[in-house]
Amino acid sequence: MSESAVAADPEVVAFPGAQAPARRRFVDSGGLRIAVHEWGDEQAPPLLLAHGGFDFARTYDVFAPLLAAGGYRVVSWDQRGHGDSEHAALYTWDADVRDALNVLDSVSSEAIPVIGHSKGGSLLTHLADACPHLVSKLVNIDGLPSRARHPDVAEHERSRLLAKELADWLDHRRVVASAARKPGTMAELARRRGRMNPRLSHEWLLYLVAAGAQHDADGWRWKLDPSMRFGGFGPWRPEWTLLRLPGLPVPMLGFLASISEPMGWDTTEESLRPHLPPDAEIHTLPETGHFIHIERPHEVAERVLRFLA
């Protein structure tokens, strides 16, 4: 595991309120190098942030400093195949959970608060349920699913459904094994990302390109492994998280978007309520899309800090 201060990059694009992490280091997770980024005082109480699919830790460059200013050592990591972490031969939900545990183990041996957005929210919900001795409180930012479970079917039919998922997933991995992401200018990459994040400003998306893409000889490319695809968490369905919610053993604060977006989950309080633990606190933010912490960083940070106090 190595650690260093983050050096200034002459090609970084400025954005109001954004601060690059103060430190970066790497954690070994089963032989894979996982990049870990930190904001705030190293001696402050730690909390863990998990990003969503197709994102990276630097998407918290506005939100994380607000939590650090509230007195926390804020730690996030680039999930395998994302950002500055190494690409892997295969990607599975279980591998992501193991990576999260390895990062958490490098931060604290005691229970700490965890915050996740989208896929990261479901990931940390899973972790909090499985390892409540490691998690003191959970904040889930639009990572709570409400899609209906598969109806009860015969076991041989259930196995057939899973077999097709696995075959499709492995076929995709074979086809893209030697693929490379399409290059472009910074502005082109920002516009492409904007098609998936239509509510985020072009200025913010340019900032993300500078933080999360690499400049090759033929142009800029996102660092994301080209084999990744939506829903590419391996044989896992988001709605399985619903089964864990009623007995969640740690306090939970949840945020939901009110505007549908391509990368969003379209979960509503009404559909979620039957599955929530009794003391869960849920807020639906009006006129807000999937990237709640980017659209409303100050409001979300204030609510989170009150919840953690």
PLM-predicted stretches and their roles:
Residues 123-127:
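Hydrolases whose catalytic domains are alpha/beta-hydrolase-1, hotdog thioesterase
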Residues 179-263:
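Alpha/beta-hydrolase
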Residues 246-288:
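Conserved loop-alpha-helix segment in the C-terminal half of the alpha/beta-hydrolase fold
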Residues 27, 32, 69, 79-115, ...:
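Active-site loop/oxyanion-hole signature of alpha/beta-hydrolase fold enzymes
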Residues 285-297, 301:
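Catalytic histidine-centered segment of alpha/beta-hydrolase-like enzymes
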Residues 129, 136-181:
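Flexible "cap/lid" loop of the alpha/beta hydrolase fold
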Residues 37-86:
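Conserved HGGG/HGGXW glycine-rich cap/lid loop of the alpha/beta-hydrolase fold
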Residues 1-47, 69-72, 109-110, 145, ...:
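Alpha/beta-hydrolase fold catalytic core
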